[in-house]
A protein has these predicted regions:
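Hydrophobic alpha-helical transmembrane segments of multi-pass membrane proteins
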Residues: 72, 76-79, 121-128, 202-210
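Divalent metal-coordination and catalytic microenvironments
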Residues: 21, 95, 153, 182, ...
């Protein structure tokens, strides 16, 4: 704790992280503002289905194409989590992008190496379960509150502690926390990336890291901070 405070005060750690990490992530995310729910549903999901069908006919594809598809699919997943991190309006879009990121990673890996169905199922089972729970929690919260944005801290844990708890579990689930099979599935994913495939490993690892940050950000914006309603006493920010 002493070293952390020293780093903040004397070495300007917070400003350094803001310069080299948070600002670049936000800048990249702003370049992806064209990504909305409609484009995800009408373009990228059909593109994923097309990629899955291409895998079924993998033997008929040129080897040059097969060799670059893993990096392409993993990059699409990385783009999704960048957009999720910078999203300031719809928590539904941010959540869906994190979930779909894992499906793009799975598609990249099946093109990259021979992977058993059980390994992919083990990896995606936790994502599907946690993603479903989180999406249902968002739907229920929207029914109650009508308007939920992630442009500010809403503090809904004050009125909805149960939603906050289940959404936190779902967030930990889709970010690979060791409460679902995805935690082990991520290790299985990396076992199918060669030691010479630096770009693919970078895309996948970066996706896991940024998706974790983006997921916790959604939870924090919806449930933490001062309560957006002012019918009760609120502490000053300085306190």
């Amino acid at each position: 704790n002493t070293l952390y405070i020293l780093a903040l005060k004397e070495f300007n750690l917070e400003g350094f992280l803001n310069l080299v990490l948070w600002k670049p992530l936000k800048t990249i995310g702003k370049l992806l503002d064209f990504l909305d729910i409609k484009r995800v549903y009408y373009f990228f999901i059909p593109l994923f289905v097309l990629g899955f069908l291409a895998y079924k006919f993998k033997v008929d594809l040129p080897q040059q194409l097969i060799s670059v598809l893993p990096e392409v699919f993993a990059f699409i997943g990385l783009v999704f989590v960048f957009k999720s991190f910078s999203e300031r309006k719809s928590p539904f879009l941010a959540w869906i992008l994190i979930v779909l990121n894992h499906f793009w990673i799975a598609l990249a890996i099946v093109f990259n190496d021979k992977v058993s169905v059980s390994e992919i199922a083990f990896y995606l089972a936790g994502i599907i379960l946690a993603g479903g729970i989180g999406y249902i929690a968002l739907l229920q919260l929207k029914k109650i509150e009508m308007r939920i944005l992630i442009s500010q801290y809403l503090g809904h844990v004050y009125e909805h502690p149960k939603f906050a708890f289940f959404f936190l579990l779902a967030t930990l689930g889709i970010t690979g926390f060791p409460i679902t099979s995805t935690f082990i599935g991520e290790d299985l994913i990396f076992s199918h990336i060669g030691s010479n495939q630096v770009i693919l490993a970078f895309f996948v690892a970066s996706s896991f890291v940024v998706s974790g940050i983006a997921g916790i950000r959604i939870y924090a914006r919806l449930f933490l901070g001062p309560h957006v309603k002012t019918y009760h006493e609120l502490p000053y920010k300085s306190s």
